[in-house]
């Protein structure tokens, strides 16, 4: 009987201990929090590491432990910064003398205030971190997205050098990759007196996490004769070339890459057509299935103009044929309403480039938030 009572006491103690156990572990430089909310795309662990009185390193992973590869952009800490850890309900707080970092153990939601409690930065309400498994050539990782709330009067500056004619990236989209005339840095400074640095080395996107779509994936296309399924492409050669005018249907305008096996030819453009001195027109109608602001990206070399709904939406732009560039613009369209579209292109070279793709409308409130996406990484890391 005595042995039974002892067994019951031990069992009760184990149950109570497991229920009352801490949801966080304090470390030498911060805290690790176990997120209680389950979900395949959710974080299981969130970590704060204090890097300075105003600098917090935030990590999150859907795995049972952190993948902690050596950062290629962060220098080692020379000294530790004093901090405290406290818990109130399911909120764990790490405090320095100038900033406080909070995380909800229930959802993993994160936010930051100054020492007086004034909000600095808040993760998307309900949780702004998602992880999607990805595997490339046997290497596993995650496509991650991190979203923060953003007031209407906020401005974002940074992201590197993109020749995009954009300065304030609030409500804008930018792809972050390295290119001949494009220098990408996943770092922004806010007019609200804080900055965010995403520690990721893969393709990233600020703003809309989706890739631009081919026109035919978003719109119904009609050629210049009204036949559905494509636009009309008309290729008029230089008179001196002796070639004939070529007319064909175009289900997309995507002439942005050289063929690997023949670097004198561009993917999807007609072969054996003399582009030097030629004039090209793509025209027809587009019909959206949604109403709203459609965001286009024009890839261009040579001389290019774009008309939509009989309006010149992109005045003539020029770029040397061997060094193309991108230009972003937006047009409001109405669901079910066909509008004319025309692209006039003078390649200005034997090998030249052209492309027009589009993003479907996004809720303006969502578009205005601070959104980061990384194609492939081991875990989420930002400062």
Regions found by a protein language model. Give the residues of each.
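Sequence-pattern detector for short linear motifs
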Residues: 7, 73, 148, 251-252, ...
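N-terminal accessory segment at the very beginning of proteins
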Residues: 19-218, 278, 293, 308, ...
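Hydrophobic transmembrane signal anchors and adjacent membrane-proximal interface regions, especially
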Residues: 4, 10, 106, 219-221, ...
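Intrinsically disordered, low-complexity peptide-like regions
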Residues: 3-6, 197, 249, 260
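Generic detector of ordered secondary-structure context
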Residues: 11, 40, 179-180, 228, ...
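Bacterial Sec-dependent N-terminal signal peptides
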Residues: 1-30
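Extracellular/secretory pathway-exposed regions associated with glycan biology
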Residues: 212-295, 299-382
